[in-house]
């Protein structure tokens, strides 16, 4: 594994890591949203994997988070607490448009924290598919 992607910035983070901060804040329309990423390059054929650590304003249990995620469009929860009970980018996510969420658990270091493992096929679920989905929403809600 190479512990950085893209060029280093003055603050010690890389451009890729800062893009994660800016894009997350843009999606949530909240420039005060705190994001602390570390991007690494792992030699795989394709696929994105993220260990996501979030802190919420109010405590949410892993069970409640799982229930919410199971209702989210385009998300598949694969979260069994056993070997193989989690998604990987090369097996489960390969050639699918879904984003898989696994290893949903409460953060033992922060009362209002959750930890998730998230994977997707970045060739399928990326800018191209997102553009199509945005166009479909625009046509459905604003043009048709």
For every predicted segment, state its role:
Residues 9, 37-39, 84-89, 101:
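Sparse, context-dependent recognition of short Cys/His-centered cofactor- or disulfide-binding micro-motifs
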Residues 34-36, 78-83:
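Flexible, glycine/charged-enriched surface loops at secondary-structure junctions
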Residues 1-71:
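Active-site-lining helix/loop region of Rossmann-like oxidoreductase modules
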Residues 5, 81, 105:
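Residues at the C-termini of beta-strands that transition into short coil/loop
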Residues 8, 42, 84, 108-111:
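A broad, structure-centric signal for solvent-exposed, well-ordered loop/edge residues
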């Amino acid at each position: 594994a190479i512990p950085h992607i893209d060029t280093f910035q003055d603050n010690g983070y890389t451009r890729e890591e800062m893009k994660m901060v800016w894009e997350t804040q843009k999606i949530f329309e909240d420039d005060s949203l705190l994001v602390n990423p570390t991007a690494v390059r792992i030699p795989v054929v394709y696929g994105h994997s993220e260990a996501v650590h979030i802190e919420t304003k109010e405590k949410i249990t892993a069970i409640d988070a799982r229930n919410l995620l199971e209702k989210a469009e385009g998300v598949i929860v694969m979260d069994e607490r056993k070997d193989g009970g989690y998604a990987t980018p090369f097996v489960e996510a390969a050639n699918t448009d879904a984003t898989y969420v696994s290893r949903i658990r409460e953060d033992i270091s922060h009362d209002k924290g959750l930890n998730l493992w998230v994977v997707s096929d970045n060739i399928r679920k990326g800018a191209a598919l997102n553009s199509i989905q945005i166009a479909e929403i625009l046509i459905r809600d604003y043009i048709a």
